[in-house]
């Protein structure tokens, strides 16, 4: 597993992330290559091609979106828009048809309106993530959000929104996983669940 906060931003001299995937996949004895967590705005066509072409690269991707609202993404300083995220997911799914896609979603971030939240719900319904890590926002000292933005969404509302998206994702995950019923696939057991 290649691990980094923005792992796909890797560059060293003339080597980019796609080259790194190819180099790791070429190592004798390597049968499975995974990586986490890529940054949406740094995903290149070369990286998508490497994922699609290399049988060692698992067709699974954790691609954090955080919110379905452009205004929230801007407040979070994410550096990409929802339309850019949608476009990236479309390109990934076109290149890797059985891609398993997971994400991170935060509700109750500073200034999140009801419409911002509804945009997140609609994005989840559209993207149909296989799974998602979902959180309610809480202040972290030392961050730009803590220094510059008021934590103005009431805690009860954060919890209500979190419960709603968890229920939605559980339903989506159940539906998405139905595609595997009755199929035999190769798996790697990593330990007891």
Model features per residue range: what roles?
Residues 1-114, 125:
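Conserved SAM/AdoMet-binding glycine-rich loop
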Residues 61-63, 132, 187-189:
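OB-fold and OB-like beta-barrel modules that bind single-stranded nucleic acids
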